Design a protein with these regions (language model features):
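NTP/phosphate- and nucleic-acid-binding module
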Residues: 1-65, 70-611
């Protein structure tokens, strides 16, 4: 079946075979039955319908809301009188595979909106779907006795859906609104081949071992406390050391690249957010409070807790007259921001409500944009190479909800493309994926087990300088509007540390590891020698630990190795008498001895990393 065509690409969109036939367009680019992203989108969307068909046969009272394909699979939101749990997934999956083997054709037909209302008159979930459709007719996809409202696209036959796996049952509010009823959401995945499915499931098992939430607890790096608040991470001592090492590395890297450190407040008057447009375009993601007015006769004034750092940087630029000779002017801030996320999407450090960005804003002339974006891209490359990440980039263009003229958007988008083209970098296009105030380059990294993560962004903004009326004086003594480039390379420290934790499975490289080595004295006679080495390293801000409890030697060694430090150092009589250390090297997976001086110099050198 790998040579079978299951759909087509038309104007960068995926359409199914029946839709292509209806359009009557020839020479379309075919989508073959394989594990390409386009093919998997078709397969997974259809697998969601196959799951719904199986559930309908097993639970005849089942009602379905929506069932899209998502990045790594699919889901369907539904409700049944009898609750469905993870234990039921095996039986549903068995039914799905039986239906797939029947090779049932998947067909589309159309009915009017009125007919659809009548057809689904007893199904409140379908009525909710119809409420979202502003068209005179709707499409329905049918396979056997099962049919559902859907825009498509779908594969032409269930025979293409034999490699499926249901993964978990969760809850989801109808339409994502917590005021509505809770539905059952079932997640699954599907591939074209059995081998690809097995490889993906194997990766998921490895991902469980690397889960940063699990490792963060085991290594005592960070915690969450519901009494403090969901999505608000608390950094424990070792986690703070880890984060501090990363911050120091990036801070010095910015200074060497002629960025100037700045710091803005956490609270800004809502007046500022109204000028910027965030108040009208981003308000649902912000937190607000009120502060009493200095004049007791006036009402309290509304303030917004910043969801991003850019406004203070704009004000810093505009607080005095700027000359063209100062440009480009690069400000950076490790700024803490707050953004409202629904509780259902919070996920460890990857998705939080409070986080700190490696934020920078570059103010430059129009003719400096490409050069500045190139410098940022080179900065990105230095960071990704240092941490061993492969990465890809994607330009996100103007979304439906946006501000600014077409001319400004085109100019900004072309500047990003120009920089990438000059560096001969491959990039994708995400149509409509830009922020409301400008196009951007998204940086997506690939970790050690092949997962892709969204991290940093580079964004050209002609809009905020206009809104805040900031200027510089050009060589002709004329006021000119600067261009503003927003950029965050790692995105946020929280998210990047989560990704690093899973990428390295908790075995951080020495230069950012919170604890560089653990000394295990064989008995109390060897503790002072360990303390001498520890003190010498501490003079260079290098943190180590000594495991000198009353536990057995083997237990202390095991406990030290569980901390995933690079070096467990055993100290006994021979080491003390000869100024040696016995090293268990985690990365090399070997044991060897060094002189005390050699060990100290080795650790110092490993920590002397620059970007």
């Amino acid at each position: 079946m790998h040579n079978d065509i299951i759909g087509y690409k038309y104007n960068d969109k995926i359409i199914d075979i029946q839709t292509a036939q209806e359009m009557g367009i020839e020479n379309l680019e075919p989508i073959f039955f394989d594990n390409s992203s386009e093919s998997l989108e078709l397969i997974r969307h259809s697998a969601a319908h196959l799951m719904a068909q199986a559930i309908k046969e097993l639970y005849p009272d089942a009602k379905f809301y929506v069932g899209p394909s998502i990045e790594n699979g699919f889901y369907y939101d539904l409700k049944t009188e009898e609750s469905i749990t993870d234990k039921d997934l095996k039986n549903i999956e068995k039914k799905m595979k039986a239906l797939a083997k029947k090779k049932i054709p998947i067909e589309k037909y159309y009915i009017s909106m009125d007919e659809a209302r009548k057809k689904f008159k007893d199904d409140e979930l379908k009525q909710a779907v119809l409420d979202m459709i502003n068209e005179d007719k709707v499409s329905i996809y049918k396979q056997g006795d099962f049919e559902d409202l859907c825009r498509g696209p779908h594969v032409p036959n269930t025979k293409y859906l034999q490699n499926v796996k249901l993964q978990k049952v969760a809850g989801a509010y109808l339409g994502g609104d917590s005021k509505n009823e809770m539905l059952t959401r079932i997640y699954g995945t599907a591939f074209a081949t059995k081998e690809a499915l097995q490889e993906y499931l194997k990766m998921l098992e490895e991902a469980k071992k690397r889960d940063h939430r699990k490792l963060g607890t085991e290594l005592e790096l960070w915690m969450f406390d519901e009494e403090i608040g969901a999505g608000m991470p608390i950094w424990l001592p070792k986690g703070t050391l880890l984060r501090g090492n990363l911050e120091k590395l990036l801070y010095s890297a910015h200074i060497r690249r002629n960025y100037l450190p700045v710091k803005g407040p956490e609270l800004l008057r809502s007046h500022m957010w109204k000028i910027s447009g965030h108040y009208y375009n981003y308000k649902e993601n912000m937190y607000f409070t009120e502060i009493e007015n200095d004049d007791p006769n006036k009402p309290a004034e509304e303030y917004g807790i910043k969801p991003m750092n850019c406004l203070s940087h704009v004000k810093i630029f505009g607080h005095k007259v700027r000359s063209y000779k100062e440009l480009p002017l690069r400000f950076f801030e490790f700024g803490t921001v707050h953004r409202h996320e629904k509780s259902g999407v919070l996920h460890g450090l990857l998705r939080v409500r409070e986080f700190t960005q490696d934020d920078a804003h570059i103010f430059c002339r129009d003719d400096q944009i490409e050069d500045e974006v190139i410098k940022v891209l080179e900065f990105v490359d230095a960071i990704m190479q240092r941490f061993g990440f492969e990465y890809e980039m994607e330009i996100s263009t103007r979304p439906e909800k946006s501000i600014g003229s077409d001319e400004i958007w085109e100019k900004a988008t072309n500047a990003l493309k120009g920089a990438l083209n000059r560096l001969n970098r491959n990039y994708g296009i995400d149509e409509g994926g830009g922020a409301f105030y400008g196009p951007k380059i998204d940086i997506k990294i690939t970790d050690a087990i092949g997962r892709k993560w969204q991290c940093g962004t580079i964004q050209v903004d002609f809009n905020l300088p206009e809104r805040f009326d900031i200027n510089y004086i050009d060589e002709n003594n004329t006021k000119k509007r600067p261009v503003m480039i927003h950029r965050a390379i790692i995105g946020s420290f929280e998210r990047f540390i989560a990704i690093l934790t899973e990428h390295y499975a908790g075995e951080y490289p020495t230069f950012i590891a919170p604890v560089k080595a653990i000394f295990v004295p064989i008995n109390e006679n060897h503790v002072n020698y360990a303390k001498e080495i520890q003190k010498e390293l501490l003079n260079d801000d290098i943190i180590t630990e000594i495991y000198d409890s009353s536990d057995s030697l083997n237990k202390r060694i095991r406990n030290a190795e569980k901390q995933k430090v690079g070096y467990v150092v055993i100290i006994g009589d021979e080491e003390v008498e000869n100024d040696l250390v016995a090293i268990r090297d985690r990365k090399k997976r070997e044991q060897y001895k060094l002189s005390k001086g050699e060990f100290v110099e080795m650790i110092k050198k490993l920590c002397e990393v620059k970007l």
